[in-house]
């Protein structure tokens, strides 16, 4: 989905679809390998002004290897689960540069709003104009994911909370998160990222977006073209993933959003992308000088 993109684009004749993707069936559906862009649920006659990218109304939805960006809504601009849903399972997915137009005090104020049963592994949630996740109720299982650079002010600051909500069951382990509520006590099992370039805990990427929130047209990247949130080799995300903590078969993975195998470098990276600057794990051959004909030489 990164190099050869299948795009669901909400732009129609100068306007926008309210929701680019809507899951309105009580069964199961899979979104795999799509670029979901340019939904706008914040204006017009939209009855539900949340979920510009994906509106999950009913049933169970699996989102795999997708990029959800540049969507707008009053709240929950990227993805919204409503209380009538069953389960959301999201893996190897990037949710970036989505914009909320509502007030920070309102419900659903986040790029991704979750209810009931939400499970995420190896996702990158970044540069959204709102906190990354609001887990409103139910349970949230979050592993090996990045939440960084999500802010309601437009300027990234250390105090920006990346994840909020009142979910009753939380299992949040081995993620890289900029900031979270103090009472959640996340830092013994997660990495706290820095916003200071040059800091060892600053997550540098190959070709990230420059700014926060949706853009009106074109690309907002230093190298041009679509954003690529692949970590550089100096990033704290590299070789920091841990698949052993994931007991849910729905979340099991062995490759990233590009199909790059986790064996590269010896362990997976945190987030949807694997760094491509590392060599695959191979055999180690030892060459010793002056063999003495003993078992040790």
Regions found by a protein language model. Name each.
Residues 41, 152-153, 291-294:
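A short, flexible beta-alpha/helix-coil linker loop
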Residues 16, 214-215, 246-247, 292-297:
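Short, solvent-exposed loop/turn elements at domain surfaces
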Residues 37, 148, 178, 286-290:
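Predominantly extracellular/luminal cell-surface or secreted proteins
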């Amino acid at each position: 989905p990164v190099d050869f993109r299948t795009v669901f684009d909400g732009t129609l004749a100068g306007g926008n679809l309210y929701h680019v993707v809507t899951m309105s069936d009580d069964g199961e559906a899979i979104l795999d390998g799509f670029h979901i862009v340019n939904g706008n649920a914040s204006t017009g006659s939209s009855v539900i002004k949340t979920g510009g990218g994906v509106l999950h109304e009913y049933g169970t939805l699996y989102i795999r290897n997708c990029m959800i960006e540049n969507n707008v809504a009053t709240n929950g601009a990227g993805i919204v689960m409503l209380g009538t849903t069953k389960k959301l399972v999201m893996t190897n997915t990037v949710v970036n540069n989505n914009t909320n137009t509502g007030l920070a005090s309102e419900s659903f104020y986040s790029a991704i709003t979750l209810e009931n049963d939400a499970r995420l592994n190896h996702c990158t949630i970044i540069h959204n104009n709102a906190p990354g996740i609001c887990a409103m109720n139910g349970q949230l299982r979050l592993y090996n994911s990045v939440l960084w650079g999500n802010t309601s002010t437009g300027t990234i600051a250390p105090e920006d909370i990346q994840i909020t909500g009142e979910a009753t069951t939380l299992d949040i382990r081995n993620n890289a998160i900029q900031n979270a509520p103090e009472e959640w006590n996340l830092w013994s099992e997660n990495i706290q990222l820095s916003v200071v370039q040059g800091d060892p805990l600053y997550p540098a990427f190959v070709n990230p977006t420059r700014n926060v929130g949706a853009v009106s047209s074109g690309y907002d990247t230093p190298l041009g073209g679509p954003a690529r949130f692949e970590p550089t080799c100096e990033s704290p995300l590299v070789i920091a993933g841990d698949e052993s903590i994931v007991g849910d078969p729905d979340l099991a993975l062995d490759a990233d959003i590009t199909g790059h195998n986790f064996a590269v470098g010896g362990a997976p990276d945190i987030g949807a992308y694997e760094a491509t600057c590392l060599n695959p794990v191979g055999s180690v051959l030892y060459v010793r000088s002056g063999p003495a004909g003993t078992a040790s030489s």
